[in-house]
UniProtKB/Swiss-Prot annotation:
Motif range ('HIGH' region): 41-50
Subunit structure: Homodimer.
Protein name: Tyrosine--tRNA ligase
Gene behind this protein: tyrS
GO molecular function: ATP binding; RNA binding; tyrosine-tRNA ligase activity
Organism: Mycobacterium leprae (strain TN)
């Protein structure tokens, strides 16, 4: 077993912090390792930021190592301290439900071969399994005794909270719970490497120390960069202040695809390195195309396709690609099934057209928000910039016929090349 996985993580830019990489490389060369990453159910779904550590687990598995994915049923009831203040504690049944949903998502990203026959089939665990039976006395004696307050106060987030609004003992103790997870996984499964986001470094190192002090073993830590755009914005925040969720009911496959196809040239190659398994030569070719022929957006299209297949599957990806092409005039709208068309349009502005409402094209442009006024709508029509169902409208007197409504219900309005809205007949 070679340490080539570390070389791959290096050229992909996926190592933010680590314990001694030479020592880790030596252990990787000695044989398969067991590697873990944990994910707290603080929401009903994982989001795009979780993909980077998840895919690093997958990269380790492809290199012959065994991944453990941990759903934080216990730690999710506490919440990792953050700068903006105390978290609202969720009910136990809510956390349990979210943990089950997230467990199902985690299982899609690693391979579950027969553990009895395979040396690197994935394991999924919930830390509630060992945390729940532990009494307060056991926790303080077996875990808390190994930590000094000075060490815990050294974490940046803790220090900032203490200098501001303060922090509860509940959140202050989160580090100990996560550290104990590492010790438990080392004892149960021989886990010797924890992976997480760079904001988890303090918690992960606490686990490394606990394993050394309590069990006398040397284990390793590696963090990946947090996912941000070139301007420093968190990935997905342009979706209206929320996250890009992996659950298709929270972020539709169409919205997911559109987000990544609109990635900036400054970010797209980095995201391809982080989120895909493309080889170096493929990435070089896409980077060269982005520089020489940026209008083709070849890298963006590849990124959107790869990530949508990864999260939503090939069939959903084919449907959203077809919908995307059709909405922007590069395919036949009539070939879209109604569910796909409706989902795509609901990611835009949809105006309702009720019986008796004005239905002229000028009225529809204003109602949909594509034009700020009737005068602006008329000017856009005169300039040839308005299309309905990809057919250019040449008269401001145009009104839709029954046969114009796709599936008897929908009109697709477009102003210019990229401004789209839907009209739904109700």
């Amino acid at each position: 077993m070679s340490s080539s996985i570390l070389n791959e993580l290096g050229w992909r830019g996926l190592v933010a912090q680590s314990t001694d990489l030479d020592a880790l490389a030596d252990e990787l060369r000695r044989g398969p390792m067991t590697v873990y990453a944990g994910f707290d159910p603080t929401a009903p779904s994982l989001h795009v930021g979780h993909l980077v550590p998840l895919l690093v687990l997958r990269r380790f598995q492809r290199a012959g190592h065994r991944p453990i994915v941990l759903a934080g049923g216990a730690t999710g009831m506490i919440g990792d301290p953050r700068d903006i203040g105390e978290r609202t504690l969720n009910e136990a049944y809510t956390v349990a439900e979210w943990a089950e949903r997230i467990r199902g998502q985690l299982e899609r990203f690693v391979e579950f071969d027969d553990v009895a026959k395979s040396r690197n089939g994935a394991i999924v665990v919930n830390n509630l399994e060992w945390t729940s039976p532990m009494s307060a006395i056991e926790f303080l004696r077996d875990v808390g005794k190994h930590f000094s307050i000075n060490l815990m106060l050294d974490r940046d987030t803790i220090r900032r909270r203490l200098n501001g609004q303060g922090i509860s003992y509940t959140e202050f103790s989160y580090m100990l719970l996560q550290a104990n997870d590492y010790a438990e996984l080392h004892q149960r499964h021989g886990c010797a490497l924890q992976i997480g986001g760079s904001d988890q470094w303090g918690n992960i190192i606490a686990g490394v120390r606990l394993v050394r002090q309590k069990l006398g073993a040397t284990v390793h830590a590696l963090t990946v960069p947090l996912v941000t755009a070139a301007d420093g914005a968190k990935l997905g925040k342009s979706t209206g202040g929320g996250s890009l969720w992996l659950d298709p009911e929270m972020t539709s496959p169409y919205a997911w695809y559109q987000y990544f196809i609109n990635t900036s040239d400054a970010d797209v190659i980095r995201y391809l390195r982080w989120f895909t398994f493309l080889l170096p030569e493929e990435l070089v070719e896409l980077e060269q195309t982005t520089v020489s022929r940026p209008q083709e957006r070849a890298a963006q299209r590849r990124l959107a396709t790869e990530l949508t297949v990864l999260v939503h599957g090939a069939a959903a990806t084919q449907a959203v690609e077809h919908a995307s092409r059709a909405l922007f005039g590069q395919g036949e709208l009539a070939r879209l099934d109604e569910a796909t068309l409706a989902t795509a349009l609901r990611e835009t502005v949809v105006a309702e057209l009720k019986p008796g409402n004005p239905d002229g094209i000028v009225d529809l442009l204003v109602a949909s928000g594509l034009s700020p006024s009737r005068g602006a709508a008329r000017r856009t029509i005169d300039e040839g910039g308005v299309l309905v169902n990809n057919i250019r409208i040449q008269s401001e007197e145009w009104t839709p016929r029954t046969s114009d409504f796709l599936h008897g219900r929908w009109l697709v309005l477009r102003r210019g090349k990229r401004n789209i809205a839907g009209i739904e007949r109700v």
